[in-house]
Amino acid sequence: TPNMDTLAKRGVRFTQFYAAAPVCSPSRAGLLTGRYPVRAGMPGNAGSTKGRAGLAPSEVTIAEMMKATGYATAHIGKWHLGYTPQTMPNGQGFDYSFGHMGGCIDNYSHFFYWQGPNRHDLWRNGKEIFEDGKFFPELMASEAAKFIEQNREKPFFMYFALNVPHYPYQGYAKWLKYYKDLPYPRNLYAAFLSTQDEVIGHLVETVDKLGLRKDTIIIFQSDHGHSHEERAHFG
């Protein structure tokens, strides 16, 4: 993972840095509001069905605060904090949004497969879009690069919520071959982590190419630890 290692070496590494919750939605609510998840109204995961409740519009997010001071704001990637116009990213302070609103998707079909009914879940600024067969993390990197380039002359805040290494573990074929001698399921997880590292490298490369590194703060963290679920090959 050379790109993640470089971020750690060139930056400050926090060894006592805690996520707000052990599952996705409450942790993300804590991250975006700075409040304990229960106080933010998110004690557990938000429903992944359209119309279910999510992060209340009355909660003030970091995107709203940054926007109020003149920053362009973007959400790229996983949301998992609501599926209504009021609770989706554009209703929570983000000028631009691209990604999936539910907890997870297949990275190529962009369908939500957690439980039935299975449905398509890919959105740009509140409108459903279709990018059949395109690897979602690569789409994220491309969308992020466009946003950065368009806003390079002014301050911007980007919430780049990478869905890797969340299941389903769909690493690049070259990494699956590279780790073929590792025992299952470490081979799958290692391939997905190396895939994640490549995507992070593309994002940082964009920042460097545009000469923005000195004026950009990159914070790298996870919303929680690894999963022991069957879908995650029991950890």
Q: What is the role of each PLM region?
A:
Residues 1-235:
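Formylglycine-dependent sulfatase
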